[in-house]
């Protein structure tokens, strides 16, 4: 994702840190903008990670967060028993209100959900570069609105929030 952005934007002040969040040094109030894309649901402590990200962003800076969500607003979260869409490393899938609460609790303000999109088989499919299983293999063949484990099919949301 970073290389695609850099190719088209060509900015010399845009960079990617290819490291796990816990391996980053303490960076206090440094970044103007942080993208957290498809990572949070893999974390065992998502609110702690959000609080850590919030500490890295300058006052007035922004977080852009892409995450799996449930399409409801009850303030609840799915904790898959063992797997979600055949992935063992998915721990928490919040609904929209729950994600907003997590962001506020982590110290962010002006939280906004700017997009909610169901993941499609066209978007995540086998290609010449990736021949492994794809979304079609992760969904219930009898009910494509469910994963093979019986959970709601993947829906992604993008949130913005100010530090």
Report the location of each language-model feature.
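Acidic carboxylate diad motif detector
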Residues: 65-67
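A short SAM/SAH-binding and catalytic strip from SAM-dependent methyltransferases
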Residues: 31-46
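Class I SAM-dependent methyltransferase SAM/SAH-binding core
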Residues: 1-23
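Short, glycine-/aromatic-enriched active-site segment of Class I SAM-dependent methyltransferases
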Residues: 69-90
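A short acidic, Gly/Pro-enriched loop at the edge of an enzyme's catalytic core
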Residues: 22-34
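Short alpha-helix
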Residues: 90-113
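Conserved catalytic loop of SAM-dependent methyltransferase domains
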Residues: 109-138
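A short glycine-rich, Lys/Arg-flanked "PGG" loop and its adjoining helix->strand segment in the class I
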Residues: 47-62
């Amino acid at each position: 994702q970073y290389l695609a952005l850099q190719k088209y934007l060509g900015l010399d002040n845009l960079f990617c840190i290819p490291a796990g969040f816990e391996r980053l040094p303490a960076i206090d109030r440094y970044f103007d903008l942080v993208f957290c894309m498809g990572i949070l649901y893999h974390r065992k402590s998502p609110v702690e990670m959000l609080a850590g990200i919030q500490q890295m962003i300058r006052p007035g800076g922004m977080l852009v967060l892409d995450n799996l969500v449930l399409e409801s607003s009850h303030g609840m979260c799915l904790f898959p028993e063992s797997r979600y869409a055949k992935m063992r490393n998915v721990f928490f899938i919040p609904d929209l209100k729950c994600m907003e609460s997590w962001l506020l609790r982590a110290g962010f303000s002006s939280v906004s959900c700017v997009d909610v999109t169901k993941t499609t088989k066209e978007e995540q499919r086998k290609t010449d570069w990736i021949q492994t299983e794809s979304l079609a293999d992760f969904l219930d063949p009898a009910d494509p609105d469910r994963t093979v484990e019986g959970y709601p099919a993947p829906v992604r949301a993008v949130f913005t929030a100010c530090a």
